[in-house]
């Protein structure tokens, strides 16, 4: 049976281990060479690895700080945008209220103007009616006066005799003389 040392490293490899050197054949590497290589890598690679990790840590921290600053700026911009939105909504409400007020005022002015026009039309109509009424009354008066004059002339012509005409002429001549004497 074989010993444990022969299982781990056969006796053919012990001769190579006796000489100090590095076996580059990966299939022929024994445990000591492997530990030696790992130790050297660990000893010299530790500083490089630490530097890489520190650089990576700084990069991550800087990235986090930049992200936090961008988040803060974005939050501030969002707050400003919300404030502007709120102001815009207030301004829109104000404009809407002003528009509704103007519309209501214009509607009232239009209704008032229509009422005034209607009132003026009514007054004009009433004036025209009164004018036509006065004209009709005047025409009726003229007709009544004409008819009365015609009847009076007919009546006078029927009653007028020569003797009555002479008396009337004498009476009026007397009146004219009396007026002439008063004026002189």
Swiss-Prot record:
UniProt keyword Protein biosynthesis present: no
Intracellular or extracellular location(s): Plastid, Chloroplast thylakoid membrane
Membrane topology annotation: Single-pass membrane protein
UniProt keyword list: ATP synthesis, ATP-binding, CF(0), Chloroplast, Hydrogen ion transport, Ion transport, Membrane, Nucleotide-binding, Plastid, Thylakoid, Transmembrane, Transmembrane helix, Transport
Domain of life: Eukaryota
Major localisation: plastid
GO cellular component: chloroplast thylakoid membrane; proton-transporting ATP synthase complex
A Pfam family hit: ATP-synt_B
Positions of transmembrane segments: 29-49
GO molecular function annotation: ATP binding; proton-transporting ATP synthase activity, rotational mechanism
InterPro entries according to UniProt: ATP_synth_b/b'su_bac/chlpt
HAMAP family on file: ATP_synth_b_bprime
Summary of the function given for this chain in its UniProt record: F(1)F(0) ATP synthase produces ATP from ADP in the presence of a proton or sodium gradient. F-type ATPases consist of two structural domains, F(1) containing the extramembraneous catalytic core and F(0) containing the membrane proton channel, linked together by a central stalk and a peripheral stalk. During catalysis, ATP synthesis in the catalytic domain of F(1) is coupled via a rotary mechanism of the central stalk subunits to proton translocation.
Family: Belongs to the ATPase B chain family.
Record's miscellaneous remark: In plastids the F-type ATPase is also known as CF(1)CF(0).
Subunit structure: F-type ATPases have 2 components, F(1) - the catalytic core - and F(0) - the membrane proton channel. F(1) has five subunits: alpha(3), beta(3), gamma(1), delta(1), epsilon(1). F(0) has four main subunits: a(1), b(1), b'(1) and c(10-14). The alpha and beta chains form an alternating ring which encloses part of the gamma chain. F(1) is attached to F(0) by a central stalk formed by the gamma and epsilon chains, while a peripheral stalk is formed by the delta, b and b' chains.
PANTHER family named among the record's database cross-references: ATP SYNTHASE SUBUNIT B, CHLOROPLASTIC (PTHR34264:SF3)
Protein name as annotated: ATP synthase subunit b, chloroplastic
Native source organism of the sequence: Adiantum capillus-veneris
Gene that specifies this protein: atpF
């Amino acid at each position: 049976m074989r010993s444990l040392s022969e299982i781990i490293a056969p006796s053919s490899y012990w001769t190579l281990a006796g000489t100090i050197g590095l076996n580059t054949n990966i299939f022929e590497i024994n445990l000591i060479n492997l530990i030696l290589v790992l130790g050297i890598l660990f000893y010299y690679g530790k500083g490089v690895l630490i530097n890489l990790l520190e650089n990576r840590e700084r990069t991550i921290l800087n990235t986090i700080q930049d992200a936090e600053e961008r988040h803060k700026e974005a939050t501030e911009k969002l707050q400003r945008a919300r404030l502007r939105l709120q102001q815009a909504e207030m301004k829109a409400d104000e404009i809407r209220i002003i528009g509704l007020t103007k519309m209501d005022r214009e509607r009232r002015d239009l209704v008032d103007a229509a009422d005034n026009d209607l009132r003026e039309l009514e007054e004009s109509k009433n004036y025209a009616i009164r004018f036509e009424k006065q004209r009709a009354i005047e025409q009726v008066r003229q007709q009544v006066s004409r008819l009365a004059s015609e009847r009076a002339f007919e009546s006078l012509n029927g009653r007028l005799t020569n003797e009555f005409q002479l008396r009337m002429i004498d009476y009026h001549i007397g009146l004219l003389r009396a007026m002439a004497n008063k004026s002189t």
